[in-house]
Amino acid sequence: NVVVLATGGTIAGAGTNAFASQXGPLGMVVEGK
């Protein structure tokens, strides 16, 4: 379950950080990167 943010970042769903952010500072923050 990956949600693409307006910033260009992504959130890996289902309680996992397995997916790296595709750029985008907000996505990185939400993923805890």
Curated annotation (Swiss-Prot):
The keyword Hydrolase applies. Homotetramer. One of its GO terms (molecular function) is asparaginase activity. It is an enzyme of class 3 (hydrolase). The active site is at T10. This is Glutaminase-asparaginase. It comes from the Bacteria. Its main location: periplasm. Residues 1-33 form the Asparaginase/glutaminase domain. One of its GO terms (cellular component) is periplasmic space. It comes from Delftia acidovorans (Pseudomonas acidovorans). Induction: Repressed during growth on high concentrations of 2,4-dichlorophenoxypropionic acid (2,4-DCPP). It is found in: Periplasm. InterPro entries: Asparaginase/glutaminase-like, Asparaginase/glutaminase_AS1. Belongs to the asparaginase 1 family.
